[in-house]
Swiss-Prot record:
Ranges of Basic and acidic residues composition bias in the record: 1-17
Broad class of the protein's primary localization: other
Task performed by this protein: Acts as a GTPase-activating protein (GAP) for ARL2 with low specific activity.
Protein's name in the database: ELMO domain-containing protein 3
Gene: ELMOD3
Species of the source: Bos taurus
Length: 381
């Protein structure tokens, strides 16, 4: 009896749904209303797969929206935080669980708590100067870093000596977070594979491209993608890197920017700002982001290509070390504009094209690859 009732009730519902979208038995309505009525019988989980919705939401220029507001990025971060709560306990999932995003502060805390003594032995905190160079630096150079900040500086340089260990869960989570944030993917990816070339590494294993910057290069990328304002900047630079003429390997360029930040720290170019803020790591992070922003501006406005990379980076290094405070002010102005929805590196420029090659096919010259008379051989960390 109950089964007959339920089957009759279900038939009634099905008939009602059919009638509600039937042109012959419903009053005339516009196309939008018809589309809404057609979706009534579809579950929410299935809506994202519906062809009509996919057509409505598809971007005309392929891989991502041109402009994403900081409000949208913040909402995505809040939703990701909700997804990391266990429904049965209400507590956060284990931090070792695959798929968990990792914050910059959590990754940094890992390095603050593990034994790095074997790596610390390798660092050279400051540049050794002799003769007239030492006298000139003493008389006209920047101030010495405060004694209380030197341990923090040494930590930065020590992290730059650490390589990527694919067996370390924390290292894997950093890579996964960078990939997900830059691409918008919700799924884990392999730690080796062609997808890393798509993001601008020159090989399928990111560990092979960290020369001269170590794990600090990945921490800098993590810093860039874990804040909604700098994430917007990172995605714009990524779009520029995929321009059909001006393409460059995004992640490899980022590694070179980290090298510049390391060198600026060792040459004490950032000491004045570190002393003023009484911090080292936030200053180095901001200097990295500001330098990357400056590079993107030069690259776009001066129509640079991959063949210009080495000389652009060398000129950028010299100007950044000469006026770090001005560079940091530029970043502050840009991020303030992002908050108001008024800042954009690219505007309406179309940056992707079908002819853009993989990073491994580009001949990229980094700072370390310049002739010795240009690079001055100062890249020992």
């Amino acid at each position: 009896m109950n089964e007959n009732f339920h089957s009759f009730h279900e038939k009634e519902l099905r008939d009602g749904q059919v009638e509600s979208v039937s042109a012959g038995s419903s009053p005339p309505c516009d196309k939008d209303s018809s589309a809404l009525l057609a979706f009534r019988g579809i579950s929410i989980s299935e809506l994202k797969n519906h062809s009509v919705l996919q057509a409505l939401t598809a971007e005309a220029n392929a891989w991502e929206p041109r402009v994403v507001s900081t409000e949208v990025l913040q909402a995505q971060e809040e939703w990701e935080a909700v997804e990391s709560i266990h429904p049965e306990t209400g507590s956060r999932a284990s931090m070792d669980q695959p798929g968990q995003l990792i914050s910059f502060s959590e990754a940094l805390q890992h390095f603050q708590t593990v034994d790095l003594s074997s790596f610390k032995k390798r660092i050279q905190p400051t540049i050794r100067r002799t003769g007239l160079a030492a006298l000139r630096h003493y008389l006209f150079g920047p101030p010495k870093l405060h004694q209380g900040l030197r341990e923090e500086r040494d930590l930065v340089l020590t992290i730059a000596q650490c390589g990527l260990d694919s067996q370390d869960p924390m290292h894997g989570r950093v890579l996964q977070t960078i990939y997900k944030k830059l691409t918008g993917s919700k799924f884990d990816c392999a730690l080796h594979g062609d997808h890393w070339e798509d993001l601008g590494f020159q090989g399928t294993n990111p560990a092979t491209d960290l020369r001269g910057a170590g794990f600090l290069a990945l921490l800098h990328l993590l810093y860039l993608v874990m804040d909604s304002k700098t994430l917007l900047m990172a995605r714009e630079i990524l779009r520029l890197s995929r321009h059909h003429i001006q393409q460059f390997p995004f992640c490899l360029m980022s590694v070179n920017i980290t090298r510049i930040a390391i060198q600026a720290l060792r040459e004490e170019c950032l000491s004045r700002e570190c002393n003023r803020q009484q911090k080292v790591i936030p200053v180095v992070n901001s200097f990295y982001a500001a330098t990357f922003l400056r590079l993107a501006h030069i690259w776009r406005t001066q129509h640079k290509t991959i063949s210009d990379s080495g000389f652009v980076l060398k000129d950028l290094e010299m100007s950044a070390k000469k006026s770090p405070r001005r560079l940091l002010k530029t970043l502050e102005t840009y991020l303030a504009g992002v908050s108001k929805g008024q800042a954009s590196l690219l505007g309406t420029q179309k940056c992707s094209g079908p002819q853009a090659p993989h990073s491994k096919d580009l001949t990229f010259t980094g700072v370390c690859d310049l002739p010795s008379h240009l690079s001055e051989g100062t890249w020992l960390i």
